Amino acid sequence: MLRQWQELAEQVREHQFRYYVRDAPVITDAEFDELLRRLEALEEQYPELRTPDSPTQLVGGAGFATEFEPVEHLERMLSLDNAFNTEELTAWAGRIHADVGDSAAYLCELKIDGVALSLVYEGGRLTRASTRGDGRTGEDVTLNARTIEDVPERLSHSEDHRMPEVLEVRGEVFFRVADFQALNASLVEEGKAPFANPRNSAAGSLRQKDPAVTARRRLRMICHGLGHTEGFRPATLHQAYLALQAWGLPVSQHTTLVADLAEVQARIDYWGEHRHEVDHEIDGVVVKVDDVALQRRLGSTSRAPRWAIAYKYPPEEAQTKLLDIRVNVGRTGRVTPFAFMTPVKVAGSTVAQATLHNASEVKRKGVLIGDTVVIRKAGDVIPEVLGPVVDLRDGSEREFVMPTTCPECGTPLAPEKEGDADIRCPNTRSCPGQLRERVFHVSSRNALDIEMLGYEAGAALLSARVIGDEGDLFGLTEEELLRTDLFRTKAGDLSANGRRLLANLDKAKAAPLWRVLVALSIRHVGPTAARALATEFGSIDAIVAATTEQLAAVEGVGPTIASAVSEWFTVDWHREIVERWRAAGVRMADERDDSVPRTLAGVTVVVTGSLPGFSRDEAKEAIVTRGGKAAGSVSKKTSYVVAGDAPGSKYDKAVELGVPILDEDGFRKLLEQGPPAEAGEPT
């Protein structure tokens, strides 16, 4: 059962990575949801498998580090649960009725196919903009967000709505269809590859290193929710939207307040027929309980509010020619067939390939190479081959045969265990396909984030035998790089990219321990678990010396990840990788500043309101450097809440849960002496 859980969790994490980091998903929304539901059902049956690091407990983008500075949301920024049919929508409404009766009215909003963004206004001035990230911590994209036409630097004065001291507002960044088409046309004229769809282009444009590039791309934004507020407590969401509009923030003109489920369904049906009349892409309708007090009663899971749901429309379809089926070997050895097709427009973007998952799925769909096939964009995002148009066959089609040996190394393929639909290459150490994927993983943003070591560069280094595996990366020299055409000029000198690669590799040697742990490709160890292990043990050697039980006892790790870590370090060539990196100068231990006493080890502190003696960042830094956790929301696990001037809803939550509340003097004593600290009302 543990192995089944591990496989499911690994698949979910892989698809989350492809969606949130690469912007290149390979399965449909429905297929992903089915994987997640299977994982949830397994954890319900065997609760001991559920760990804080499980995909079922995290918001979709959790654990994928980026090149932008991390910033903590004032209040959690959650995802939405989905409904794909009337039955699922009715079941959700039934749960609402069971909890709060017939009193709930609903807001129906268009589900914009874009990128979530959180804005923070303090005293009416924009102070921060961040992406969703893992729901607690996102990327700071303030400079880029300021270039968006719809995002005001300062809120407008309103006679009817008092401006709040602090306003955290959530919304969606997107492209209008016409602007997206113009952007792609300009990219083609410049000889660059066009974006696949508006969502990908919005994500890429918002995360540009140069804000001037973002400014040229005509991004738009619509606000659709609130986070933390101080001095603003609307009774209903539609009243909140009126206030946002009065302050100059963009809100949708297509939002409708309705009384019951029948009216909800009517709005869903209407927009299903008129979706292309909107100037931006939509992939559904979001339904929310309007009453804020009822929202609080309904609460949320670890990843989504119970008072809202996204109804997803059936995807659009098109026909095209299936030119070939080829297989790809992934980082873990999984062999996946892919359909290569004549490029065709579906739901506003061009599709040329799609995953077929495994041989059983190819057989189930009944597709042959040479078929005319029906494809769709599930959730209007992910391409999927539905099946063949049998009537158009002319006899030239041929059956796809899954290889019995690895196309990369020739090793016989086999399922990991009897009954598995997936087959794998067991040659984990030296299979060229797996090697390329592992080298690429070392350089990825959620690992060591090494620029100039992309997929092409890694493949070139391996094919030229400059490196044998990822263990050789940090010992690379200028002479060795000159053996590859990719890093050699026509004059025979090292190229600028080659020099940058060597500099970036040298810089990566000083990366924090958690990034090194992620880069080692230990199964199940993402940034969340890696950070927990690095914080607890401080060095690779201490982690290796720890027992499985000691590893499992770390918050955020648990037995599954602990077993994977222990097993990984028992393999000889795994340990060789570590030692080669160590010998090349990669730091295998975090440096701790012993001059600052760790008075807050194991203590979780939430700060609300303004403190005269600390900025928000200074207060957080003071907590973290003393070994504590600076959290963004109050829960039963919160040790203390520090309340300054004009505290917000976090103060109320602390009172409700009985969490000790400190003023600034109490906070200073806590920093100096550690707990127990004397609680006191804010001054």
Curated annotation (Swiss-Prot):
One Pfam family in the UniProt entry: DNA_ligase_aden
SUPFAM superfamilies from the UniProt entry: BRCT domain (SSF52113), DNA ligase/mRNA capping enzyme, catalytic domain (SSF56091), Nucleic acid-binding proteins (SSF50249), RuvA domain 2-like (SSF47781)
Residues reported in the UniProt entry to bind Zn(2+): C406, C409, C425, C431
Catalytic reaction list: NAD(+) + (deoxyribonucleotide)n-3'-hydroxyl + 5'-phospho-(deoxyribonucleotide)m = (deoxyribonucleotide)n+m + AMP + beta-nicotinamide D-nucleotide
Cofactor: Mg(2+); Mn(2+)
Gene3D superfamilies noted in UniProt: 5' to 3' exonuclease, C-terminal subdomain, 6.20.10.30, BRCT domain, DNA ligase/mRNA capping enzyme, Helix hairpin bin, Nucleic acid-binding proteins
Listed GO biological process terms: DNA repair; DNA replication
Domain of life according to the entry: Bacteria
Residues involved in NAD(+) binding: D29, A30, E31, F32, D33, S79, L80, E109, R132, E172, K288, K312
GO molecular function, one term: DNA ligase (NAD+) activity
Function: DNA ligase that catalyzes the formation of phosphodiester linkages between 5'-phosphoryl and 3'-hydroxyl groups in double-stranded DNA using NAD as a coenzyme and as the energy source for the reaction. It is essential for DNA replication and repair of damaged DNA.
NCBIfam families to which the protein is assigned, alphabetical: dnlj (TIGR00575), PRK07956.1 (NF005932)
PANTHER family per record: CHROMOSOME TRANSMISSION FIDELITY FACTOR 18 (PTHR23389), DNA LIGASE (PTHR23389:SF9)
Family label: Belongs to the NAD-dependent DNA ligase family. LigA subfamily.
Protein's UniProt name: DNA ligase
Organism, as annotated: Mycobacterium ulcerans (strain Agy99)
Gene that this sequence comes from: ligA
